[in-house]
């Protein structure tokens, strides 16, 4: 259901979801626990963020002093397109935060993006010190003025529109910046994304609680989501197919999996039901259908589910490649295709789901 909802959102362009404050707090805490000074004297850019509505801006503004930030920059897209699609969704307590500000100009407000800034001064800084002004353009992250802000920043943190995710990743990697973004687990299989994971330039973050991500949405798009996905009491939608993607280090990433031997898995792992590990028809590797069934004593290539990346420890395994489609690309797959035809991993002529090929580091 989660994957289907991401697809529906992308197709309908209803792809602006507002991240919950506790989810942001939980994720950021994982990096602070690993390195308490991770944000000290740094500039953070929050693009695609709609500061009037965003918990990202609220969170970092409220914790500006706690984190020792140098500067916080948050940009929003022009109000006209947002109001047309979604209606108003203010998260700041004062709903007149913009319209009563001396900078407010009703004749250009709908067409111009905004930039919100908070800068280190010789006094305690809090959210009330947040200043804003209009951008020259509409605030699109691809514009030259937002690119300049990107180049100024040390960190880029946001929940980019799902429909522009590939474009955003390309924009992000035009520079060598630290980043933390939200995306679909499906994005891992994109040809623009997986090589970054393979080369250890991007990995999964700490993750959402119990694998569930909840986002605020406007009521007028709630009809797009099934019962059990949208909660009309909270105005939240739930996705299970959602993750944080980052190049910031965190402790869980370096926790090796506790694994059983091949023989013990066959004997005790209830998911395997006593079955031997099988080799693929078309790749020199064995099929491991569950992450917790990876054998500790197997040194050759294994195919594992995409969800393995939630537990991936780079000191324990190396990622060789991935196959998720019928087409074969040696640069992506990383293994030789032994039989011509459908390149998806197969066992006894039956294809599996997408698989990542890994090998234990000796």
Q: Where are each of the predicted segments found?
A:
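Class I S-adenosyl-L-methionine-dependent methyltransferase catalytic core
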Residues: 1-362
């Amino acid at each position: 259901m989660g994957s289907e909802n991401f697809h529906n959102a992308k197709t309908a362009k209803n792809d602006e979801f507002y991240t919950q404050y506790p989810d942001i707090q939980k994720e950021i805490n994982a990096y602070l626990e690993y390195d308490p000074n991770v944000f000290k004297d740094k500039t953070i850019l929050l693009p695609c963020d709609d500061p009037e509505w965003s918990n990202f801006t609220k969170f970092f503004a409220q914790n500006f002093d706690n984190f020792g930030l140098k500067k916080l920059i948050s940009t929003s897209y022009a109000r006209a397109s947002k109001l047309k699609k979604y209606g108003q969704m203010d998260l700041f307590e004062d709903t007149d935060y913009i319209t009563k500000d001396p900078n407010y100009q009703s004749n250009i407000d709908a067409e111009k993006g905004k930039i919100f800034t908070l800068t280190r001064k010789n006094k305690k800084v809090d959210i009330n010190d947040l200043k804003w002004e209009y951008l020259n353009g509409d605030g699109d992250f691809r514009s030259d003025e937002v690119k300049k802000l990107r180049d100024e920043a040390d960190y880029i943190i946001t929940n980019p529109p799902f429909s522009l995710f590939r474009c955003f990743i390309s924009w992000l990697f035009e520079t060598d910046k630290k980043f933390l973004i939200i995306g679909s687990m499906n994005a891992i299989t994109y040809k623009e994304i997986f090589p970054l994971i393979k080369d250890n330039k991007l990995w999964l973050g700490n993750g959402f609680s119990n694998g569930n991500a909840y986002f605020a949405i406007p009521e007028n798009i709630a009809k797009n989501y099934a019962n059990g996905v949208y909660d009309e009491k909270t105005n939240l939608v739930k996705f299970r197919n959602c993750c944080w993607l980052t190049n910031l280090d965190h402790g869980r990433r370096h926790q090796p999996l506790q694994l059983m031997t091949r023989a013990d898995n066959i004997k005790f792992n209830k998911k395997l039901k006593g079955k031997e590990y099988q080799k693929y028809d078309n790749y020199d590797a064995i099929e491991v259908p569950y992450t917790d069934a990876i054998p500790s004593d197997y040194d050759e290539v294994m195919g594992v589910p995409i969800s393995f990346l939630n537990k991936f420890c780079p000191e324990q395994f190396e990622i060789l490649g991935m196959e998720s489609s019928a087409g074969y690309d040696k640069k992506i797959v990383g293994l030789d295709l032994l039989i011509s035809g459908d390149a998806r991993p197969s066992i006894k002529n039956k294809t599996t789901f997408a698989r990542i090929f890994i090998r234990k580091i000796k």
